[in-house]
Amino acid sequence: MNVLNRDDIKTFLPHREPMLLIDDVTMDGDTAIAHYHVRGDEFFLQGHFPGNPVVPGVIQCEIMAQSSCILVRDELVGHTPLYSGINNVRFRQPVRPGDTMEIRARITSRRGMIFFVDAKALVNGKACCSGELTFALIDNK
């Protein structure tokens, strides 16, 4: 199992700071296991909520989506992954500064260049977010 760091991840994903939201990822068979440490100075915490910062749910979903795209890293050359759907998302506990999210993502099916993924995010072993994600690989122009 090779661990990809942020520099490695940038060779596959088009995301860059401040929108690159995974710190490392490891492939374990058909599952991507990624991490993101919430530092507390992220742009999305400004105003969400003053004095009680919580990672917005949509950002948690984006973290899961980026983690999922690593599953098809060999097919990303010449393509951009676009998040195209989300189903059955549940938020179970808040994610706060100082927390490290662990994301587990697995492709459940594929239709051409469209991928369906089950993803779950945990903090300290407890589920904070889960859902079914869909993304498509589109040709770069």
Q: What do these predicted regions represent?
A:
Residues D23-T26, N87, R92, R104-T108:
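Conserved positions in beta-strands of structured domains
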Residues P14, G29-D30, V95-D99, R104-K141:
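HotDog/MaoC-like acyl-thioester-processing domains
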Residues V25, V55-G78:
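Active-site helix/loop of acyl-thioester processing domains in fatty-acid/polyketide metabolism
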Residues N2, S67-E102, I114, S130-A136:
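Hydrophobic beta-strand-centered segment that forms part of the acyl-chain substrate-binding groove
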Residues V3-D24:
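Flexible, low-complexity linker/boundary loops enriched in proline and small hydrophobic residues
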Residues M1-N2, K141:
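Short, low-complexity, intrinsically disordered N-terminal peptides in bacterial proteins
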Residues L4-D8, R39-G40, F44, F49-P50, ...:
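Residue-level signal for pocket-adjacent positions within structured domains
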